[in-house]
Every structure is written in structure tokens, then in C-alpha cells.
Design a protein with these regions (language model features):
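Conserved P-loop NTPase-based nucleic-acid remodeling module centered on helicase motor cores
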Residues: 1-46
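Accessory N-terminal region flanking or inserted into the helicase ATPase core
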Residues: 28-126, 135-140, 163
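Residue-level signal for well-ordered alpha-helical scaffold segments within enzymatic catalytic domains
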Residues: 4, 106-110, 143, 174
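Phosphate-binding beta-loop-alpha motif at adenosine-nucleotide cofactor sites
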Residues: 9, 103, 181-183
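Generic structural marker for isolated residues within well-ordered, non-membrane alpha-helices
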Residues: 18, 22, 51-52, 172
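Conserved helicase motor core of SF1/SF2 NTP-dependent helicases
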Residues: 124, 131-183
Length: 183
């Protein structure tokens, strides 16, 4: 997504951006991109950006994610979350600040908005660990598959370990196509 959107390093939300927002809002916000670089996966440490990111990953509004039974208690409630989400959107995509800044989840969303004609074409695509893909990542796979000659998807729903980060193993389970079970 980064490459296909022609982004540069300065287009990606970084620690300075989150520090600026934290200072402006007087709330400690964490950089979700930092965890992904360090560990390969992760959600923000603070509950506010975690809920906002999970909403984007799951293709729902922040309000719907806030009301999800797994969300739990949120200090400050919905009004505080809404305030933070609006401030982040204004900072990243318009308003007073003349910039477009993306976190990794935003990149996937923008990639999925691209016209099919503008997407890369591949002879073969191999997706591994598919049981740990989120709804948003599955949308990306579907888009890429439309311009791919052969698509191989590997995964084991019994090995799904990233449900806490939005993984949706049911998409792998319900996938149509030829199946070959390896033992």
C-alpha cells in the first residue's frame, strides 16, 4: 500500500506527530506504527487510538467499536473518544494543518479505495497465515485477487492468534475455491 500510494517517509505518522497531538489534547497517545515495525504486529498502547484503529481495521465506525462488548470500560467514555478521533482526523487529513499523514491502517484503507485499473497486476500471489488477516486486509486481498492470475492462500484457523488485533479467521474458513488440506 505504501508503494502503491506513492508515499514517502514524511507522509507516515511518527512519534513527533503523536507527541504533538498528545500535547495539544493533553492525552497520552501512542504511535501504532512503532509497534508494527518492532514486533510485526500490534495495536497502540493507549485505549483511545487502539479503539479508533480497531474500528478502521474492522470496517466499522469508532462508535460501533466503542459499543462492542469486548471494548470494555473507556475512561471519559464516548465523548472523549469522539473528540480524540476528530482531532486525529483533522491533524492527519485536513483542517488547520496542511498535511496528509497516514498510519499503516490508513494506507490499507486508501489502497482499497483505488480504482481497479490503478492496482498492480500479478501472475501469482501467495498469502500465508491467512487466519490472522483482519477484515480490512481481506478487502485488500480481494482487490488484489481481481488482477491476479493465480492466488494461493495458506492458513490454519486453529492457529489464529491475532483476534485481539482484528483477525477474522472466519473469512479463511468460508472462502470459496479449491481446497487442499496438508497434513
Amino acid at each position: 500500500a505504501y508503494k502503491e500510494l506513492y508515499l514517502k517517509e514524511e507522509d507516515v505518522m511518527n512519534d513527533d506527530d503523536y507527541a504533538f497531538l498528545s500535547n495539544k489534547l493533553q492525552i497520552k497517545l501512542s504511535n501504532p506504527n512503532k509497534k508494527i515495525k518492532s514486533y510485526g504486529a500490534g495495536l497502540p498502547d493507549d485505549v483511545f487510538t487502539r479503539i479508533i484503529d480497531l474500528a478502521k481495521i474492522n470496517g466499522v465506525t469508532a462508535h460501533e467499536q466503542f459499543n462492542h462488548p469486548d471494548t470494555g470500560h473507556l475512561p471519559g467514555g464516548w465523548l472523549k473518544l469522539d473528540y480524540i478521533e476528530r482531532a486525529m482526523q483533522e491533524y492527519k487529513f485536513g483542517g488547520k494543518y496542511p498535511r496528509r499523514k497516514y498510519d499503516y491502517t490508513d494506507m490499507l484503507i486508501e489502497f482499497n479505495k483505488k480504482d481497479l485499473d490503478d492496482l498492480p497486476q500479478f501472475d501469482v500471489v501467495i498469502i500465508d497465515e491467512a487466519q490472522d488477516l483482519s477484515w480490512l486486509q481481506w478487502q485488500m486481498v480481494k482487490r488484489i485477487a481481481e488482477k491476479t492470475k493465480r492466488l494461493y492462500i495458506a492458513g490454519d484457523d486453529d492457529q489464529a492468534i491475532f483476534k485481539w488485533a482484528g483477525a477474522r479467521p472466519e473469512f479463511l474458513i468460508n472462502m470459496k475455491g479449491t481446497r487442499k488440506v496438508l497434513s
